[in-house]
Amino acid sequence: MDFEKKGYTVLKKVLDQPVANFIYKYFLMKRKIADIFYKNKYIPPNSSEWGIWTDIQVPGTYSVYGDIAMETVLVELKPLMEKITNKNLFETYSYARIYKKGDVLHKHIDRFSCEVSTTLNLGGDPWPIYIEPGIEINLDPGDMLVYRG
């Protein structure tokens, strides 16, 4: 299996297009509402439950930690990830980010609790991920990359 050998594998169409599109539009709407809430001071500027634009990895890009929609996806996809990795996994956290044109997530090492991680494209244009220099992986909406964090 790819994961055992290479440390990553791509799973096509893990989420059906209507499901991926629904979650994608949900996050676009959540970002819009969060922007209104912050600008109109309905919520404190240091609040994070509606999402933030201050993540140091990709500043100025909307992201949200532990959203119930992504926590649900995490739990639902856990059996598939355990099968792919041949490991008993424990959910640690979910994190969603809406990339915009020009955003770059530079090479980094995930925290220790992310021994196995996943990236899931929910919507927008296909975009490349570079696992290692010269290894480009393109994900369409609904596709998922499982990798050693």
Q: Can you annotate each of these PLM segments?
A:
Residues E76-L80, Y95, S117:
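Generic beta-strand or strand-like secondary-structure segments
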Residues I98:
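Conserved active-site beta-strand element of glycosyltransferases/polysaccharide synthases
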Residues Y8, Y93, P128:
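A residue-level signal for beta-strand positions that form part of recognition/binding surfaces
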Residues M1-T85:
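Non-heme Fe(II)/2-oxoglutarate
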Residues K101-G149:
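Catalytic core of non-heme Fe(II) oxygenases with the double-stranded beta-helix
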Residues D2-K5, F90, G123:
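A short, polar/charged loop/turn motif at coil->beta-strand junctions and beta-hairpin connectors
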Residues N86-Y95:
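A short coil-to-beta-strand element that immediately follows conserved catalytic motifs
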